[in-house]
């Protein structure tokens, strides 16, 4: 495919063509009226703007079930993220292997940030450890954190945190499922 129209792209994205054109214009991509968007150029622009033109080195902290599963997840590599380090504070786990990497001690974090250029830290620890891990990541120079622990982290300005709360996501799905099963007589009672 050499080019794609805004109508085709909007159908794939689930948005209207005008919204898609407006959003793409913010990237500096305007397309050609009647021709569409050059697929190769558009993909390159989006990749560059999203910061995916390079591999981002990632460390996963917490080698329990979730941390090991995240370390083994192959989808990161296809999206420009390379897990270069796995760490845990539990000395019984240090030195073991997880997803082909040797589990390192938290004391090694500052050196790993310097040597590996770690850009992103993933917290997969119990909630009571998460804030301490976040503090250590920030002190070592990491400015992007993905937090799987069910707690709100306190970090200084200039540090980006994204929280993944699987329990909340399940609650949202339960709510939506409940809405589909609520009898229609309930709305009649309100009327």
Annotate each language-model stretch with its function.
Residues 74-78, 137-140:
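Short, solvent-exposed amphipathic alpha-helical segments in soluble enzyme
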Residues 77-101:
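NAD(P)-binding Rossmann-fold cofactor-contacting core
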Residues 3, 7, 12-58:
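HTH-adjacent hinge/linker in prokaryotic transcriptional regulators
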Residues 57, 83, 119-121:
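Short active-site oxyanion
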Residues 63:
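Glycine-rich Rossmann-fold phosphate-binding loop(s) that bind the pyrophosphate
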Residues 99-191:
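Phosphate-bearing ligand-interacting subdomains
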Residues 66:
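Hydrophobic/small residue at the entry helix of a nucleotide-binding pocket
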């Amino acid at each position: 495919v050499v080019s794609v129209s805004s109508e085709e792209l909007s159908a794939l994205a689930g948005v209207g063509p005008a919204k898609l054109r407006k959003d793409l214009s913010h990237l500096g991509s305007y397309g050609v009226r009647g021709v569409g968007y050059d697929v190769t150029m558009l993909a390159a622009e989006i990749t560059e703007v999203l910061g995916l033109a390079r591999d981002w080195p990632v460390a996963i902290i917490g080698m329990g079930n979730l941390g090991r599963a995240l370390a083994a997840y192959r989808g990161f590599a296809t999206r420009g993220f390379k897990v270069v380090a796995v760490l845990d504070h539990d000395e019984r786990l240090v030195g073991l292997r997880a997803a082909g990497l040797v589990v390192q001690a938290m004391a090694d974090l500052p050196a790993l940030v310097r040597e590996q250029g770690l850009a992103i830290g993933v917290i997969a620890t119990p909630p009571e450890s998460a804030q301490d891990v976040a503090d250590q990541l920030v002190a070592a120079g990491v400015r992007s954190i993905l937090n799987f622990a069910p707690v709100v982290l306190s970090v200084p300005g200039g540090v980006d945190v994204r929280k993944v709360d699987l329990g909340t996501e399940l609650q949202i799905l339960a709510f939506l499922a409940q809405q589909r099963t609520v009898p229609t007589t309930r709305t009649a009672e309100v009327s």
